[in-house]
Curated annotation (Swiss-Prot):
Name this polypeptide is given: Galactose-1-phosphate uridylyltransferase
GO MF, any single term: UDP-glucose:hexose-1-phosphate uridylyltransferase activity
GO CC field: cytoplasm
Enzyme class: transferase
EC number: 2.7.7.12
A GO BP annotation: galactose metabolic process
PANTHER family: DUF4922 DOMAIN-CONTAINING PROTEIN (PTHR39191:SF1), GALACTOSE-1-PHOSPHATE URIDYLYLTRANSFERASE (PTHR39191)
Presence of keyword Isomerase: no
Pfam families: GalP_UDP_tr_C (PF02744), GalP_UDP_transf (PF01087)
Cytoplasm recorded as keyword: yes
Entries under HAMAP family matching the protein: GalP_UDP_trans
Cell compartments where the protein resides: Cytoplasm
Origin species: Staphylococcus carnosus (strain TM300)
Protein family: Belongs to the galactose-1-phosphate uridylyltransferase type 2 family.
Amino acid sequence: MNLNRQYVNRFIDDAIQYGDYEREDNYYLQNLILEITKAESIDETKNNNGLVNPTSNEIAQFWIQQMLNNGLLEDVVYQKEIVETKLLDLITPKPSTINREFWKRYESHPEKATGYFYQICKRNHYVKEDAIAKNIHYYTETEYGDLEITINLSKPEKDAKEIAKAREAKQSSYPANALCMENEGFVGSVTQAARRNHRIVRLNLNHQPWGFQFSPYAYFPEHSIVLSEAHEPMKIEKQTFSNLLQFVQKFPHYFAGSNADLPIVGGSILSHNHYQTGRHTFPMDHAPEMKQFKMEQFPDVQAAILKWPMSVIRLKGEDLDEMTEAADHIFETWKSYTDEKLDIRAYSQDGTRHHTVTPIARFNQTTSEYELDLVLRDNQTSTQYPDGIFHPHNDVHHIKKENIGLIEVMGTAILPGRLKKELLEVERYVLGDINAEPGSHKKWADKMKEKYNFNNENAKNIIHQEVGRIFKRVLEDSGVFKQSTEGQKGFEKFIQTL
């Protein structure tokens, strides 16, 4: 296999412009490219193979396809990603260079620093904009405001061959998980993602070392992760509230939140302490305050219950220390709070703790105040609700049965990719196609048929909006104090204990 001279030159130019190389590194880079692609030499002919003014990523994808065509690479996701990240690492500065440049730009303005880093991560295809663009995205109007609905199609699914290889592969404990620092520059394997082009910015939160990185398959603009350098499990504590507030003080254009630290109500990774951040206005940000209240011991902190399907207390203030203390007071009170009448129990008889919070911090540019939202969570199960009392109930599992994590708590649904095909079947079914197979959605589809007069013009939109209403139900199921009179009285009773 020979590589096209124009593409090699273009790639080398990008490595010199964007990476850590100079013009004298020309032949060195050329030989690295030949080694990574397993090519024998370079074709000096002028044929550009149809790519006009290609990006480095487009050239990398072209070479990967060439390798597949020549039997030099197996057509499985992890092997293609290893080659891709090795190539695109060449156009990426070293971690030390990025860290130096990031903090130099930060002195001028925090947005310049994150903007610089984000451009690098998009250019080297660590942030996969092309994949993210495949996601289905729309809004549904509800009594709580517009909920944001996404069907996640960006992450490539492993095929049977790759799953079998992963099962047979020797399990490695390095890197320990997908969120530890050791992933920076890691070559990848059948069981662990290729991260050769991955970079992490180092930062301190409360004098402890943390890392800041962007998320490859983002759920919203500049979706990023702040991860502890220490290998420690997810933990909600006083330090968490302080860290989140300190992060938004450093980066006021980003929000910062943490998943809860208990199963069922937590995120998918509980083994490594991390927060999620980014530049996005979530539906919950607009939630109106239903009832304001004061806690005497924290005179400078305003508090309010939000009109939201989940049970949220919003704290507002300018003194970060006092806000941290107020948040910790609410958290500690909630951890031991029980209301049998509402099925709310802090501990099982065997001493298992059930209560925690999902905290979200932001700096409100309009009021120049810090805000800290505490979403009350309870992870009990029961005979009636074996998956969780305050978790999506069985009748909505056909749309969503996974944990309700931080992003969804804020009103942005991350629905499974399977729904794209399944909803097309539902659409065919409601339009009267006798060969349609609505599967687990049949009961729901029949209800919609009774409610609406479907035609080719309105079917897709009606189905999408009904999915949005099911997501509203999912959030209501997950709320501990329900929107009923009894539920809201229960919420006020809890507030009085503060």
